Amino acid sequence: MSEKKINLLDLDRKAMRALFADLGEKPFRADQLMKWIYHFGVSDFEEMTNINKVLRQKLAARCEIVAPEISSFQKSTDGTIKFAIHVGEGQEVETVYIPEDDRATLCVSSQVGCALECTFCSTAQQGFNRNLTVSEIVGQIWRVSHFLGFAKDTGDRPITNVVMMGMGEPLLNLANVIPAMDIMLDDFGFSLSKRRVTLSTSGVVPALDKLGDALDVALAVSIHAPNDELRDILVPVNKKYPLQEFLAGIRRYIAKSNANRGRVTVEYVMLDHINDSTEQAHELAKLMEDTPCKVNLIPFNPYPGSPYGRSSNSRIDRFSKVLMEYGLTVIVRKTRGDDIDAACGQLAGDIRDRTKRLAKKRMQENQISVTMN
């Protein structure tokens, strides 16, 4: 059996340089290779013209550059594109491209499914399957960039911002998310500014501290409720890491972060008559009193079977005005891609059904195996 090749998309620059040292090559050769991969979208070693033929042959013998494939895509009337990305074994994740006048953002997944069971989120209904590898995370950016078109002559890339807000909780896959984000930030990787890479978390506090020790990126925090009683229901991880513990972790992170410019983005989904009253707005403002932040109010995006409804515009407006009375910066997020189920909280769709079928098949196979043994 031939030895499995190393997928170079799994390696950040430190790991790439270690590989090249093992090949008897100087570190700058690793940097050259990364530039070909991430600046120009090249996956064929023979196209890497400033790398000598002998090294190209060594690389081809031991390594490969393989990104997950696009299974299908849907384009919204507002230009948003939702991609189903095949990650092997019948599994898919969703990645969303959001074009705007001054930027082009890619919403990237970190897991197949999610284990946190937030009750307003479609992805939670899928359940958790597995963590994505580094190559499957950065490969979403690489593959969508190919779809949109790398400018191979200039190295200009079509994606300016990345948000880790797709399927999964990034902090539960820290071992792969950190090197993946390192590649996003690296000058020889996707070369994105740390203010243009955002990680969103529901509050896995110990992992948030580890992230702060490893990387500096923009942070968005999923609060969604002004007190522990309601948040225990909406975001069950709150039972393990309640609000005050989460907020303390947030303050520790932004204290050592330059990317956040001294404040964090609070995400708050607006659920009709659940968390959107005037009293709850006052409660949220007081909760965030000691945590510098701007608040992003997210109109809920319904999905089939959801127990919640979207807050009316008038309730969102009242809620927003109360927060602003406390001096908070408030943004009401414009819903993008909801006609193709690509909006916040809607990711899963047909993928949920396919994943459940796969899990059922695996369970049946395991039962057969146990019976035979």
From Swiss-Prot:
It is an enzyme of class 2 (transferase). It is found in: Cytoplasm. Binds 1 [4Fe-4S] cluster. The cluster is coordinated with 3 cysteines and an exchangeable S-adenosyl-L-methionine. [4Fe-4S] cluster binds at C114, C118, C121. PROSITE patterns: RADICAL_SAM. GO terms for cellular component: cytoplasm. Its EC number is 2.1.1.192. It catalyses: adenosine(2503) in 23S rRNA + 2 reduced [2Fe-2S]-[ferredoxin] + 2 S-adenosyl-L-methionine = 2-methyladenosine(2503) in 23S rRNA + 5'-deoxyadenosine + L-methionine + 2 oxidized [2Fe-2S]-[ferredoxin] + S-adenosyl-L-homocysteine; adenosine(37) in tRNA + 2 reduced [2Fe-2S]-[ferredoxin] + 2 S-adenosyl-L-methionine = 2-methyladenosine(37) in tRNA + 5'-deoxyadenosine + L-methionine + 2 oxidized [2Fe-2S]-[ferredoxin] + S-adenosyl-L-homocysteine. Disulfide bonds join C107-C344. Its cofactor is [4Fe-4S] cluster. Keywords: 4Fe-4S, Cytoplasm, Disulfide bond, Iron, Iron-sulfur, Metal-binding, Methyltransferase, rRNA processing, S-adenosyl-L-methionine, Transferase, tRNA processing. The keyword Protein biosynthesis does not apply. The active site is at E94 (proton acceptor), C344 (s-methylcysteine intermediate). Residues 100-339 form the Radical SAM core domain. The keyword Transcription regulation does not apply. InterPro entries: Aldolase_TIM (IPR013785), Methyltransferase_A (IPR040072), RlmN_N (IPR048641), RNA_MTrfase_RlmN (IPR027492), rRNA_lsu_MTrfase_RlmN/Cfr (IPR004383), rSAM (IPR007197). GO terms for biological process: rRNA base methylation; tRNA methylation. It comes from the Bacteria. NCBIfam families: PRK11194.1 (NF008396), rRNA_mod_RlmN (TIGR00048). Specifically methylates position 2 of adenine 2503 in 23S rRNA and position 2 of adenine 37 in tRNAs. m2A2503 modification seems to play a crucial role in the proofreading step occurring at the peptidyl transferase center and thus would serve to optimize ribosomal fidelity. Belongs to the radical SAM superfamily. RlmN family. This is Dual-specificity RNA methyltransferase RlmN. It comes from Shewanella putrefaciens (strain CN-32 / ATCC BAA-453). The lineage of its organism: Bacteria, Pseudomonadati, Pseudomonadota, Gammaproteobacteria, Alteromonadales.
